[in-house]
A protein has these predicted regions:
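Residues in well-ordered alpha-helical elements
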Residues: 41, 59, 95-98, 166, ...
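N-terminal helical cap/lid subdomain that shapes the substrate entry/recognition surface
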Residues: 2-95
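Short, acidic loop-to-helix structural element flanking the phosphoryl-transfer center
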Residues: 60, 85-111, 151
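Asp-based, Mg2+/Mn2+-dependent phosphohydrolase catalytic module
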Residues: 1-5, 102-105, 110, 114, ...
């Protein structure tokens, strides 16, 4: 019987693409006096392309933008600081996120978060979505000194939740960091489908977060 569900944040609970798109349009407007010679749609599109679904850190993204568009009145530090400060104001959850977390809570299912990233930045995003009010534990890679898919970060979460691996689901969008990473310690991995990862195949897949509820009755014997 499942007693706990662990979640990734970006691309799983947080609709990162929509959030980032909203943020970069707003950032362009804030710095328009420096960017007025660049079409807004072109600048925003190039930012999203360079971002590479979050796997290129923003200092590199901004350095490339400044170089490509020959922007000399802004620094990458200014833009990065603006990103770190203001992204939280544009966080958009995936559909049914709150309903899922509420229903898990009502069923006395423990809830945890394991996310790679910088602690303050990720905690601000979790608070922006009000996720922290549902969770029993939150592990951010910077604070833990270890990141997914290392098995230790999953084992720490199990210990904090006081559940066995076979009593826990892990829901995430990254095939290796989330699904296969959690399964290497015996957790039941669930893939939150993301077209960015192409044709990854798995026996447990959800497109809508509420579909996670269908896995709560899985018995240990189904893993053998």
């Amino acid at each position: 019987m499942i007693r706990a569900v662990l979640f990734d944040l970006d691309g799983t609970l947080l609709d990162r693409h929509q959030s980032l798109e909203q943020f970069i349009h707003d950032q362009y407007n804030r710095f328009i006096s420096h960017l007025m010679n660049i079409e807004k749609s072109e600048y925003c599109s190039r930012f999203l392309e360079l971002d590479n679904n979050g796997y290129t850190w923003k200092d590199t993204v901004y350095a490339t933008l400044l170089s490509e568009y020959n922007i000399t009145t802004l620094t990458q530090e200014q833009l990065l600081h603006d990103y770190i400060t203001n992204f939280q104001h544009h966080c958009i959850p995936f559909q049914n996120m709150h309903e899922l977390l509420q229903r898990l809570t009502q069923q006395n299912i423990k809830i945890g978060i394991i996310t790679n990233g910088f602690t303050d930045f990720q905690m601000n995003n979790l608070r922006a979505l009000n996720i922290h009010t549902y969770t029993n534990t939150i592990l951010v890679s910077e604070a833990e000194g270890i990141k997914k898919p290392h098995p230790e970060i999953f084992e720490r979460a199990l210990k904090k939740l006081d559940v066995k691996a076979e009593e826990c689901l892990y829901v995430g969008d990254h095939p290796e960091n989330d699904v296969l990473g959690s399964e290497q310690v015996g957790i039941l991995g669930v893939w939150k489908r993301d077209s960015f990862w192409g044709d990854f195949e798995h026996s447990r897949v959800v497109d809508d977060l509420l579909e996670v509820l269908s896995f709560l009755e899985i018995e240990t014997k189904t893993r053998q």
